[in-house]
Amino acid sequence: MKIIYKDGHVDECPQDQELHVIRHTAAHVMAQAIKRLYPEADFAFGPATENGFYYDVDLGDTKLTDEDLANIEKEMHKITKENLAIKPFILPRAEAVKLMEERHENYKVEHMADLADETEFSFFQQGEYVDMCI
């Protein structure tokens, strides 16, 4: 399995990290699916974990139903079939904040403010979806 690192280089993924990479990518696909179905969604964190992955997302007053979850899963399958390239890029702080503000990612902007020592931030883009990765 190949992996794209934050600096853009591609290399073989160490076997002991493969599951983590798959889960991290799945979190991005899920977030992209949610954003397509709920454009107002504001994402906080979405890490891979030891047992899977999750994403904290603010949907305002929207409460997800079982049907909504099934629709998110269908959209995830659709995104996977699109075989979108994953493109890493790094931005200096000011540009990173501007990008997240333009995309209405308020929790990401807030998180960047908490990381005062960071001068640049890593992002991954797949199709129309862009996610910040710390």
Place the predicted regions along the sequence by residue.
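Metal-associated gating/positioning segment near the N- to mid-region
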Residues: R36
